[in-house]
Regions:
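A short beta-strand micro-motif
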Residues: 2-8
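Short, mixed-charge low-complexity intrinsically disordered segments
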Residues: 33-65
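Tryptophan-centered short beta-strand motifs
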Residues: 13-14, 51
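A short, charged, amphipathic alpha-helix used as a generic interaction element across diverse proteins
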Residues: 10-11, 19-45
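Acidic surface patches and DE-rich sequence motifs
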Residues: 8-9, 49
């Protein structure tokens, strides 16, 4: 399961969706990144580097840890 987050430089982390399968998470991330005019990435066990506005897909368990 995956969560889709929006990381905003000014406001921090906002959960856009949670508990999605891979394909649904990708669809939500694609749609939200286009709507917000920001990039998107899939975080697979690493930390977010440079702090910028981005839509992020993370494993649900990784976020809870």
């Amino acid at each position: 399961m995956y969560d889709v987050l929006f990381l905003d430089r000014s406001h921090g982390e906002q959960v856009l969706a949670s508990g999605l399968d891979h394909d649904d998470a990708c669809r939500v991330a694609r749609s939200e990144s286009e709507r917000r005019g920001v990039g998107r990435m899939f975080l697979a066990g690493s930390e977010v580097g440079e702090r910028r506005d981005v839509v992020l897909i993370v494993e649900s368990a990784a976020r809870a840890a």
